[in-house]
Amino acid sequence: MPTINQLITNGRKGIIKKTKSPALKNCPQRRGVCTRVYTVTPRKPNSALRKVARVRLTSGYEISSYIPGEGHNLQEHSLVLIRGGRIRDLPGVRYHIIRGTLDTAGVDGRKQGRSKYGAKKAKVAKTASAK
């Protein structure tokens, strides 16, 4: 507990909020250009080849971002849209690429959770017995 004199000289320090996605600069999404597309192995109990892209954003930052879903069409100089959201088993990857926007294609053959992967609804063949 501080004394009155300590409060007069120093005052109370406010709590500083630290953002988890500084490259977005308080925007919901940011546009960027892929500078490198590669795979990374995850941290200890997991084993895989996670697809990652190095992206130069319009905010000036260069970040690593995860490419969700099975298969992708990204390469160097592709335009992508970035959202926040880290990948727990990839150190330093704090952003996701949004599928189905700009140069990023949606995931083919996706039936559930389509909105998260930019997949269109599959066409259903109409039968003649439906009267």
UniProtKB/Swiss-Prot annotation:
Source superkingdom: Bacteria
Chain residue ranges for the region called Disordered: 106-131
Sites of 3-methylthioaspartic acid modification: 89
Keyword check for Iron: no
A single GO cellular-component term on record: small ribosomal subunit
Compositional bias (Basic residues): 112-124
InterPro entries for this protein: NA-bd_OB-fold, Ribosomal_uS12, Ribosomal_uS12_bac
Stored Gene3D superfamilies: Nucleic acid-binding proteins
Entry's Gene Ontology molecular function annotations: rRNA binding; structural constituent of ribosome; tRNA binding
Keyword rRNA-binding assigned: yes
Record keywords: Methylation, Ribonucleoprotein, Ribosomal protein, RNA-binding, rRNA-binding, tRNA-binding
Biological processes per GO annotation: translation
Subunit structure: Part of the 30S ribosomal subunit. Contacts proteins S8 and S17. May interact with IF1 in the 30S initiation complex.
Task of the protein: With S4 and S5 plays an important role in translational accuracy. Interacts with and stabilizes bases of the 16S rRNA that are involved in tRNA selection in the A site and with the mRNA backbone. Located at the interface of the 30S and 50S subunits, it traverses the body of the 30S subunit contacting proteins on the other side and probably holding the rRNA structure together. The combined cluster of proteins S8, S12 and S17 appears to hold together the shoulder and platform of the 30S subunit.
Protein family membership: Belongs to the universal ribosomal protein uS12 family.
Protein name (Swiss-Prot/TrEMBL): Small ribosomal subunit protein uS12
Source organism of the structure: Endomicrobium trichonymphae
